[in-house]
């Protein structure tokens, strides 16, 4: 997540975000769930564009100052396949591997980005960063 955030600025493409996440995650032997994505934030909570957490560099919409969205990858220790349980909400890995999900809400500024969900006390930063 943080690697993808660090590249954010006007002019990069949405695919660059997914590529940054996917390449790092897969290099470490994990997988990125394909069934969920980040999303735009505006007058409605879930808006376009969809922010994929996998993909190819230099593809998709170009980021512009003023855009607001979430990046929220779900990373699996095994394969990326998931299923939704009968409660209609709970997502589990099909291969029963461990999984973790990370999320931030951000805005694109004239020169980069702002993390809206960052804690002033540092609670939003994992101790391993």
Where are the regions that the model predicts?
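Active-site neighborhoods and metal-handling regions in enzymes and metal-associated proteins
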Residues: 1-129
